[in-house]
């Protein structure tokens, strides 16, 4: 019985350590160690991309897209296990931080870049 209890306790401790913890005041620039979390569930946020000369490279996966309305300024925050993306103009997404859900209202605007694409 004690072995089962300790096993369950160990699983819970492991789960908690892999989740984002604490409060994050609203920011357009989450820390480098949180980018993977925030950019996985809404990749259109501007802080997920390095844009130069009309092209944007994803900071996590090296995907390259044409710079357009797909890349948006986002404000992210975390409070009491609620994670929030605010895209402005009343567009926001709130989720339970420990049970995140992908959301991307701008996915139709994403234009992947290939070497033979023109930017016209």
From Swiss-Prot:
Signal peptide: 1-28
Entry coiled-coil feature ranges: none
Glycosylation sites: 62, 116
Expression induction: Expressed in the early phase of the viral replicative cycle.
Keyword flag Nucleotide-binding: no
Purpose of the protein: Plays a role in virus cell tropism, and may be required for efficient virus replication in macrophages.
Name of this chain's protein: Protein MGF 110-5L
């Amino acid at each position: 019985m004690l072995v089962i209890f300790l096993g369950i306790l160990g699983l819970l401790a492991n789960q908690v350590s892999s989740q984002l913890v604490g409060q994050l005041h609203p920011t357009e620039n989450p820390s480098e160690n949180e980018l993977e979390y925030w950019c996985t569930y809404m990749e259109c946020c501007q802080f997920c991309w390095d844009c130069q000369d009309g092209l944007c490279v994803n900071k996590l996966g090296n995907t390259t897209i044409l710079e357009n309305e797909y890349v948006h300024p986002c404000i992210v925050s975390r409070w009491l296990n609620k994670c929030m993306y605010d895209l402005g103009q009343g567009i926001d997404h709130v989720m339970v931080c420990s049970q995140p859900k992908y959301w991307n209202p701008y996915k139709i605007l994403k234009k992947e870049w290939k070497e033979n694409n023109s930017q016209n």
